[in-house]
Amino acid sequence: MIDRPIHVIGGGLAGTEAAWQIAQAGIPVILHEMRPIRSSPAHHSQFLAELVCSNSFGAMAVDRATGLLHEELRRLNSLVIAQADQHSVPAGGALAVDRGVFSRNLTEILANHPLVTLKRQEITEIPRDGIVVLTTGPLTSAALAADLQNFAGLDYLSFFDAASPIILGESIDRSIAFLASRYDKGEAAYLNCPMDREQYLHFWQELKQAEQAELKDFERENAKFFEACLPIEELASRGEDTMRFGPLKPVGLADPRYPDQRPYAVIQLRMEDKAGQLWNMVGFQTNLKWGEQTRVFRLIPGLEKAEFVRMGVMHKNTFINSPQLLSSSLQFKSRPTLLAAGQLIGTEGYTAAAAGGWLAGTNAARLALGLETVTLPTTTMMGSLFEFISSAEPKHFQPMPPNFGILPNFTRKIRNKRERYGQYADRSLQDLEAWMNQLKTPCLV
């Protein structure tokens, strides 16, 4: 019997899942949640796993990225997904829940578990010893964020998420977009989408008129962050040529189709993953509504059929530079007994938060039992997501949702997208079952 408890800090989806996995392994766990002693600007109740935005966990079909992640978690006995299934409400092809009942039941389950102690208190410092799981989310309290920054390093904690859209590489028209670096310096590292004057002016006008998302009050108060990383629509509003002398400058780039004529403007895309399946729109951090982003950005030559795996966002979001700090087991490299999960590590979405909680909780339990920590196969959605956030380029790291672009390709080309995604799902679930069967213990811990 292990007497020393594991501490889980933060009672959101990730923390709830982590605490459950630890307790189910027979290890005492203290789950710290500051509400209702201290609330955040986005929360409205004292319940664990409160859903502060939508009540939807995303698409259910396994040929959708979130649906595949749901199914992986079901097979791994996730408490969060089991409760989402139990308290689901009709939502077409999505897994949506009665949010009040969902959060209340999860709170009761954890509070009634004999090995779980629920402590309502604000934690202002990371415990310096023992096994600890950080799951404090995007609205981590100022005091704890300051301590985390001291631990991680000044440059490895972000407080505002200003991210450009990310596009699936196969949806980019390579007959228009060309690989090159400015002035041909170094390796051809960017995909470039050239515009003539007419195309640029049309794009500029549509961008100026596009509808923006509403900022929450606490985000509006932090608008000073925008000056350091201006939205592309703000640049457009400052004049016809502002973008052309900023991120859309054409200097040093020649369109191979018209080598003697410099483009009027160029949108650059930077590779987001080692396999070149994901591409980031350089300088296109934006606060446009998602539908408007799709409409306006598909006006760019070469991106007419672009598939966005992540939309641009600008909002308050505390997250660490995971590639610099974490391994794919979600342990801190500098302190393996400290783990983290949820939006704090740069994953996006409810289901990804639960997945991170599952892995961090499982590995925390394994550490307590003297077992080696585990990582999932990278052919699974869970495994590929945590491999991505722990191995992406640290300099440009931004949060990432589950998507098929981070999975390894098949050796043979499958042109039909739905068929390809279905085969990704089949491979993932087969590899997950094989991985589970290889573990020597009766359960994962």
UniProtKB/Swiss-Prot annotation:
Keywords (A to Z) from UniProt: Cytoplasm, FAD, Flavoprotein, Methyltransferase, NAD, NADP, Transferase, tRNA processing
Catalyzed reactions per annotation: uridine(54) in tRNA + (6R)-5,10-methylene-5,6,7,8-tetrahydrofolate + NADH + H(+) = 5-methyluridine(54) in tRNA + (6S)-5,6,7,8-tetrahydrofolate + NAD(+); uridine(54) in tRNA + (6R)-5,10-methylene-5,6,7,8-tetrahydrofolate + NADPH + H(+) = 5-methyluridine(54) in tRNA + (6S)-5,6,7,8-tetrahydrofolate + NADP(+)
GO molecular function: flavin adenine dinucleotide binding; tRNA (uracil(54)-C5)-methyltransferase activity, 5,10-methylenetetrahydrofolate-dependent
GO annotations of cellular component type: cytosol
Residues annotated for FAD binding in this entry: 10-15
Localization of this protein: Cytoplasm
Cofactor (UniProt): FAD
Entry's EC annotation: 2.1.1.74
GO biological process, one term: tRNA wobble uridine modification
InterPro entries tied to this protein: FAD/NAD-bd_sf, MnmG-rel, MnmG-rel_CS, MnmG_N, TrmFO
Keyword hit for Transferase: yes
Flavoprotein listed as a keyword: yes
HAMAP family the record matches: TrmFO
Recorded family membership: Belongs to the MnmG family. TrmFO subfamily.
Role according to the record: Catalyzes the folate-dependent formation of 5-methyl-uridine at position 54 (M-5-U54) in all tRNAs.
Name listed for the protein in its UniProt record: Methylenetetrahydrofolate--tRNA-(uracil-5-)-methyltransferase TrmFO
Classification of source organism: Bacteria, Bacillati, Cyanobacteriota, Cyanophyceae, Oscillatoriophycideae
